[in-house]
Regions:
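Bacterial N-terminal signal peptides
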Residues: 13-23
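C-terminal and inter-domain tail/linker signature
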Residues: 26-155
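Bacterial N-terminal signal peptides that target proteins for export
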Residues: 2-15
Length: 155
């Protein structure tokens, strides 16, 4: 038996089995990106929709950096922001329209309404996830206009 035949009969089937095994193992476990998406959406729901600091803080890293200029850093900054929302906008809800993940970042495209007659706001929230915890947040907020120059909508 020559080297090519040995390869064909032994090495190639073993390599194929290894590739299939790795693919099956990967399919059985959620990817890190999917896990990060879950963490960000559950954190968002607890903090913004339910306004539940105790639930939201379970997802918070020990050092939470905030880039929204109206919110302070850290757990106490988040607590104060949730208290503000609960007091000032108790009916505010965010409907997550899209979730995008890349590396350690998760982006939420959200339609936020306050339970009044206004069309709400379009919000893009960006969360950085580290070791399964939310450690950083950015956002961009835009009012949804009553009339637009096109019929495409914001969502």
């Amino acid at each position: 038996m020559n080297a090519a035949e040995i390869y064909r009969r032994t090495v190639r089937p073993i390599a194929l089995a290894a590739v299939v095994g790795v693919a099956l193992a990967a399919a059985a476990q959620p990817s890190q990106l999917e896990n990060n998406k879950r963490i960000a959406t559950e954190f968002y729901d607890a903090a913004i929709n339910r306004k539940d600091f105790a639930a939201a803080s379970q997802y918070l890293g020990s050092a939470y950096r905030q880039h929204n200029p109206t919110a302070a850093d850290g757990a106490e900054g988040l607590r104060a922001f949730i208290d503000f929302l609960r007091t000032r906008f108790p009916n505010q809800r965010g409907e997550i329209k899209r979730v995008i993940a890349e590396g350690d970042l998760v982006v939420l495209h959200v339609h936020s309404t306050r339970g009044d007659d206004t069309p709400g706001r379009a919000i893009v929230d960006i969360f950085r996830i580290e070791n399964g915890k939310v450690v950083e947040h950015w956002d961009v907020i835009q009012d949804v206009p009553a009339q637009a120059a096109n019929a495409n909508g914001m969502f």
